[in-house]
Amino acid sequence: VIAEGQQAPPPWLETLDGDAPILLIAPHGGYAEPETAALLAPRVNDLHTADITRELAIRLDAAALINTAMDRNRLDCNRLDEVVAHAPWLLTMIADRLEQMVAEHGRALVLAVHGWNLVEARVDIGVGLTKRAGRLVPSRGAHVSVSDQFLTGTLNVLIDRLGRAGIVSTFGLRYPAGGAQNLMQVFTQRHSASSIDALRRITALSGRGAIEAVQLELSIALRFPGSLRDAAIEALSEILANGGDGAMRNGNHSHRSHRTAGAPTIHLPRSAPRKSARFGLEFYDPALRIGAMASFDLGVGRGGGRFMILRTDGSVLLFTGERGSDRESAALRVGPLRLRTDGGRLRLEFVGPALLTPDAATYVNIERALSQSSLETEVTFTIDFTLGTSLDVESVRAGAEGEGASGIPVRFGNFSGRMRIGGRDHSMSGVARIGPAFTALDDAAFDARRRLWAFADTDAGAIQANEFFVDARWHPGSGSDRCRIIACEPPAIHASLTAIRDEDQTVVGQVVSHIPLVRSDSRGRRFRTSIGFADFAIERHRYFGMFETSWRVDNRPSTSDSEAETG
């Protein structure tokens, strides 16, 4: 990648000088090369982190090493093994700058700016720690990259300051920065016995207690241009000024240490969850031809929630968030997305940011989709569901935690509500399905799948079809309602509905909107998927609903722990 003996930094690395004892690094600020587009599941570059790092460097008067163009699929500047093999000069450059800072100031702060492709306004702080049972502990053999004083002082004050701006902070929730090859571990004693001179120089500074090193994983809401990004930069600039001196001016340091803090109050069920499932709500307005999907992860393990809105102009609106540690009675909440039982009905509410992508077809390549997207900072909706049979949040939660997806009943009905996107209000109504998330892959024990649901607001009721391709043939799944799918690909869907006494009826669906995806099941197997909404016709009846088709594709093996650690 880099010529041996090269003295000047390569064109893709922007270097900035500063007088403060701060070194900023943007390891993944580049973009995908044309060759990367041929990969089925390339690692996504951290869009906008180069610009954010540059702005922070100017405001903090900090030095900076900014990757502005190198594709992380060619050279991952956050992986020590790749840097040693292909860009060892980068470690020397880091060591030189840190030694100079420590000589002048007696200390240095290293701040690595990364991107987390979650939409919710969140930052995950990586210092080699993760939270277990309310306590911060080192993750999988990690060395902690900050001192106790910096952890309980500066970082606590930063978390409070971000919280006042509406930004949620966590320690190592997804990215603890504890992997052996993670760049943050360079600034600890983990590699003190290395034969590499630059590494020994850096660890010598660390051994003197002269370095504090922090990895910041900024969500989409904090990276894409908008008020939340401005608020995050303002908070970081204020608290981390002069290497963290801003915290002394802004904090009272009355916080309990995160290493010893007790667990937060959690209203647990009588018995701990045994299983998990994704609970989904899908709804479609046939007049506006707008379809939406929302879902919540329930039960064991970490999870989150999300919604996706598909429109006939080909655009898609997306929100994703992380599930918190607390739970609310008669409600499910993931950040600003909330589902609650209200007077015998289910009400879905949201006020917050969402990612707007003008062309849903770009989602076959996540980085391309993100590069064409913008942030809608204020999306709001309130949707009420009226079902044929009542359903409440607590019964759904209990079913998912006790039996998994099979413990969640399926209900069809109607919805009504209001939605505001981009300053435009929509009054909505139409058909809805509630139950196990229609599109969830879970542990996909099939090579392909095709399914549909359709509902008519008449006595005609609902139809469902669910088929799996196993052992070279299609097999009907449970809940297929005598409906067999013939073809399930945009722009049209064809199926056959077997009547009880009459001849088979033809089901024809015209696709209104859809999105192609590449996604993984719980075992890491890759699938290509097409999901969307359609208008259906069965003889004289009009139905409205959804379809999905997924098939397994080959993929290169994923790296072991690097994906979770390189950020």
Give names to the regions the model predicted:
Residues 1-251:
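N-terminal catalytic or cofactor-binding beta/alpha core of small enzyme domains
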Residues 253-567:
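Structured soluble/peripheral alpha/beta segments that form catalytic or ligand/cofactor-binding pockets
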